From Swiss-Prot:
Native source organism of the sequence: Rhodospirillum rubrum (strain ATCC 11170 / ATH 1.1.1 / DSM 467 / LMG 4362 / NCIMB 8255 / S1)
UniProt GO molecular function: ATP binding; ATP hydrolysis activity; ATP-dependent protein folding chaperone; unfolded protein binding
Region C: start-end pairs: 550-626
GO cellular component terms, semicolon-separated: cytoplasm
Swiss-Prot/TrEMBL keywords: ATP-binding, Chaperone, Cytoplasm, Nucleotide-binding, Stress response
Function, in words: Molecular chaperone. Has ATPase activity.
B as annotated region, ranges: 330-549
Quaternary structure (record): Homodimer.
Record-linked InterPro entries: HATPase_C_sf (IPR036890), HSP90_C (IPR037196), Hsp90_fam (IPR001404), Hsp90_N (IPR020575), Ribosomal_Su5_D2-typ_SF (IPR020568)
Compartments, as annotated in UniProt: Cytoplasm
Stated name of the protein: Chaperone protein HtpG
Spans traversing the lipid bilayer: none
Segments of this protein annotated with the region A: 1-329
CDD domains found in the cross-reference section: HATPase_Hsp90-like (cd16927)
Amino acid sequence: MSEETLSFQAEVSKLLDIVVHSLYSDRKIFLRELISNASDACDKLRYEGLTQPALLEGDGAFRIRLSIDAEAGTLTIADNGIGMNRHELIENLGTIARSGTQAFAEALKAKSQAASGDVSLIGQFGVGFYSAFMVADKVEVVTRRAGEAQGWRWSSDGKGSFSVSEVEGAGRGAAITLHLREDARDFLDEHRLREIVKTYSDHIAIPVDYAGKEGEPERLNEASALWTRPRDQITDEQYAEFYHHVAHGFETPWHTLHYRAEGKLEYTALLFVPGQQPFDLFTQDRKPRVKLYVNRVFITDDCEELLPSYLRFVRGVVDSSDLPLNVSREMLQDDPRLRKIKGGLTKRLIDDLAKRARDDESAYLTFWENFGAVLKEGIYEDFERKEDLVALARFRTTASDTPVSLETVIGRMKEGQSALYYITGDDATALARSPQVEGFVARGVEVLLLTDPIDEFWVSAVPKVGDTALKAVAQGSADLERLALIDGKQPPDDAEHAPAETAKMDALIAAMKAALGTAVADVRVSARLTDSPVCLVAKEGAMSLHLQKLLRQANQGSELSGDRVLEINPRHALVKTLAERAATGGSVDEAALLLMDQARILEGEAPADAIAFARRLTEVMGKGLI
């Protein structure tokens, strides 16, 4: 087969351009990324070789070897792992076979424009191979997949295309040769390579050798599984570098959990909570990313049974001697031992989070900002640990821009307050100013501002926090009559409740119901409004307006007008004027429709009829009053 030239996927071309021209802050990470990929390739073959020994071809001693050619200006990183065939070469090195590629390119570009030129996103997005182009103006890969006879060569200068051709005599695995740029020739110095490997790859369980011109290859790393060492023999720096390896991140992990469980079921866990959000935190598969080993033999990095999905931000390894080496996907799904490991890991992680929250609330809030939206999924999904997870939750409120615990808010409840109140929406600042919370704020009642989509679901699973009911301010009745305003005075309501005034409001309500028809289930006087003329709320027990909106955005629902109630403020001057008009037989139809659209807009919706809304608004502006 002759050489074939192919074009990179569009997003890869953008990525390469950014890598080549912008990301120069810490170029030596390319070696860490390529060694990490080589280690993964060896792990995969070791696992496949358990059930298909012929794939090992009589060579089960896995290794990664570095070699340099000073005259040619090349650095080669070779492994005897799983290797790739033609299809895999094109799939893995010509495309980014993951969702969100455009988002990645944009995020990487934004990072590159920052003063630091942060390159941590490269590994996080599973494209560490492309970091080679930070130091090379040409990259060649010679590879042969285990169990196949044909070898292949992949070559590219990173400028939009790559070539693939057959090659004879290729060894199993992959050899990546970098033709180094003139300003990257320092990577031809063997002492520099030793330093980089010792710093970034000492924990790699596969031996990393340096092949000099004379003598036997020299071992550069310790090549022992870090998690098997006693904790007191591991430095913070070694933990951090191992985290960089398993998480493909550059930041310091926020938390490290390393322990050995003994007894009927034995396993070792080395887990990390990242210092920043992984890019794939909100992908649809919601899979945990912890590696499973059996007796230090890699089994899978795609084991959904190790952790619940709401802890999918955790990275690390779990190694057990009580699982069979030939464990299959089906066995993993049904293995009671794995369920026990999952329970143990989950409990330890939640306990550690609770301790960090007690010991250092400020540091815990950093974690919460990154992963709170995911952790709250567990409140809805994990009945057994629901109360523990509720205790870990932090929320902004109408009284606090800094997220606080529910225990704190309950401790600040007003005398006579019967429930813990919340409102859901897209933006905390907007929620704090929404009409539905006016009456609560006026009475000094603190309201939780819930802005994550998952909030709509977990609140349905938590009717009470301890002995305190949890209630939506935009649903059902307001229940504020027993609470005094902050200044200790109730509104001057004698006149408002006089028979004549009540009759006027009744006339207005009847007229507005007639004008709005089926757009609402009811129109009623509000106890929650103090400044705004109207607002929309959901009927008691009905789906919230915000959840209706989320479902419509996901094409899973429509406006449920039969569940909506329009509340009017009897103390507002505009409402009083309309009541006078309705009581004397005047029409309030146009005003009712205009106020309904105003309430819709405040809920983040469009008017029912934008053209009619604009016409009514123009007429009102022209008259100067209704």
